[in-house]
Regions:
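Residues forming the flavin
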Residues: 88
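Predominantly a Rossmann-like dinucleotide-binding segment in NAD(P)-dependent oxidoreductases
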Residues: 1-80, 110-114, 236
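Active-site donor-binding loop signature of nucleotide-sugar glycosyltransferases
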Residues: 11-13, 102, 243
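Short hydrophobic/aromatic beta-strand micro-patches
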Residues: 91
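C-terminal helix-rich "cap/oligomerization" subdomain common to oxidoreductases
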Residues: 161-192, 196-197, 201-243
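NAD(P)-dinucleotide binding in Rossmann-like oxidoreductases
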Residues: 78-80, 94-193
């Protein structure tokens, strides 16, 4: 396909807030701030991760066979019970791993899913894909660039045995001609949060009597991936997926 052979998938969601809401009376703490307590909430794996984990299944057209993970309360040491930082690794039958990371103590990188193939990379949240090999600039442009950066000033007879491989800076291509992306922090007040597409799909399904393809399956498996990931964290072991 366009991305070549998919050999890795990464997903993450970073926020910087405590999830707490004001409580008018102490006896209402667990009811109002239910997200913080294991009796009511699975924390990051169900609040955030389940929105992204199905991307791996969709890209690979298969389900993982096992998962390992770690979680801790790293920053918000305020009496909560659920983790504020998690890392998960899902292993697929073909050897591909999907890594997932989430925390609520830093929001710099926001959220993203990254599908990494031998020929290119896709970032759905940005609505872009990137090819591994970018067309080089014309010869004259390369020469001007080298002169401007004084490439020819010094000639080295010996050098390091390795060169740092920094991230690609190519601008990529839009997946669709018109695409709206939003910050992972909040969709309130955003120009588009996907609601129109969801309502449109619902109306189409209601009118035609045909549900959106794989909708229930993707929701189910995303939930299962999240819950088994939490089990792996809580039990400190690799969880093999049941048949």
């Amino acid at each position: 396909g366009l991305l070549g052979e998919i050999n890795s998938i990464r997903a993450y969601w970073f926020r910087n807030n405590d999830w707490r809401r004001p409580v008018p009376s102490p006896d209402l703490e667990r009811k109002i701030n239910w997200r913080l307590y294991k009796e009511y909430s699975c924390g990051l794996v169900t609040e955030l991760a389940t929105h992204q984990l199905q991307v791996g299944n969709w890209a690979l057209r298969m389900l993982p066979e096992k998962v390992a993970g770690m979680g801790d309360i790293v920053y918000w040491k305020d009496g909560r019970e659920v983790y504020d930082s998690i890392n998960l690794i899902y292993h697929y039958p073909n050897g591909v791993k999907m890594t997932y990371e989430s925390m609520i103590g830093n929001k710099f990188y926001g959220l993203e899913e990254e599908i990494l193939g031998s020929k290119g990379t896709m970032e759905p949240e940005k609505g872009k894909y990137y090819f591994e090999d970018v067309e080089p600039a014309p010869g004259i442009m390369q020469l001007i660039n080298q002169i401007e950066h004084k490439i020819f000033d010094n000639v080295s007879f010996a050098g390091p045995s390795w060169v740092p491989e920094t991230a690609s800076v190519n601008k990529g291509h839009l997946i669709m001609d018109k695409v709206t992306t939003i910050s992972g922090q909040s969709s309130v007040g955003a120009a588009g949060d996907g609601s129109i597409e969801l309502v449109t799909a619902f109306c189409e399904a209601a009118i035609t009597g045909k549900p959106a393809p794989n909708l229930v399956e993707e929701a189910y498996y995303s939930s299962v991936l999240g819950l088994l990931g939490l089990q792996a964290i809580d039990e400190g072991r690799v969880i093999t997926f049941p048949d």
